[in-house]
Amino acid sequence: MMLHAQHMPGQPGAPSLVFLHGFSGDCREWQPVGEQFHGCSRLYIDLPGHGGSAAIPVGGFADVIRLLRATLISYNILKFWLVGYSLGGRVAMMAACQGIPGLCGLVVEGGHPGLQNEQARAERRLSDGRWAERFRHEPLTEVFHDWYQQPVFASLTAQQRQALTALRSQNNGETLAAMLEATSLAVQPDLREALNALAFPFYYLCGERDSKFRALAQEVAATCHVIRNAGHNAHRENPAGVVDSLAQILRL
């Protein structure tokens, strides 16, 4: 089994870029950024529970990474960079730390390296469980209205919140809930030590108004790029700034 994806071929010898979206996004999320890199092969993946992969069930990160590997092989992508946002960033970090074959570099935007104690994991398990129940049983417009009131999204304007709520409400609540539980921070290990031991380039992107993830970026051995005029979802709020950072990282 493989994940649904959109593939754009590039020029021979150019880097292959594999993009992983955030929770409730899909393969279109990274395209305004990725399509600025025409020379590179670009693979935009729908994670399980999302988009064209909505019906694919997973029990945890191991299943997600197994599906990711199968998808890369199906497209004959043997050497690549992973670029992931939020949930996609956490999947990318997990894959990197588990030694996914062919990975040449890692770019994470606003991805959490992991909680560091059992109390924090227990609290997150309860929180994600409550959100999952809401995704299963309540209208998605109501759930996402409240979702985007969380402190991490404080930099969004009312208009941006409204647009995101309308966009994300096109998802399937049941499959979102299942993926939220399967990949919760409550079940993700603390990756800091493993990330600090990576033998290939690791870059971290965060919005200048995203104080939480700017602080987390200092806890991993990554080169940090701060995206101006952006909060947690920097590639949506300032795509040109993220394009500039990726061009520097990839030396294009």
Swiss-Prot record:
The protein's assembly and partners: Monomer.
Name of the protein this chain belongs to: 2-succinyl-6-hydroxy-2,4-cyclohexadiene-1-carboxylate synthase
Gene symbol of the encoding locus: menH
Gene3D superfamilies: alpha/beta hydrolase
Keyword Lyase attributed: yes
Family: Belongs to the AB hydrolase superfamily. MenH family.
Described function: Catalyzes a proton abstraction reaction that results in 2,5-elimination of pyruvate from 2-succinyl-5-enolpyruvyl-6-hydroxy-3-cyclohexene-1-carboxylate (SEPHCHC) and the formation of 2-succinyl-6-hydroxy-2,4-cyclohexadiene-1-carboxylate (SHCHC).
InterPro entries: AB_hydrolase_1, AB_hydrolase_fold, SHCHC_synthase_MenH
This protein's pathway: Quinol/quinone metabolism; 1,4-dihydroxy-2-naphthoate biosynthesis; 1,4-dihydroxy-2-naphthoate from chorismate: step 3/7; Quinol/quinone metabolism; menaquinone biosynthesis
Record keywords: Lyase, Menaquinone biosynthesis
EC nos: 4.2.99.20
SUPFAM superfamilies linked to this entry: alpha/beta-Hydrolases
Catalytic activity: 5-enolpyruvoyl-6-hydroxy-2-succinyl-cyclohex-3-ene-1-carboxylate = (1R,6R)-6-hydroxy-2-succinyl-cyclohexa-2,4-diene-1-carboxylate + pyruvate
A Gene Ontology biological process term: menaquinone biosynthetic process
MF terms (GO), sorted A to Z: 2-succinyl-6-hydroxy-2,4-cyclohexadiene-1-carboxylate synthase activity
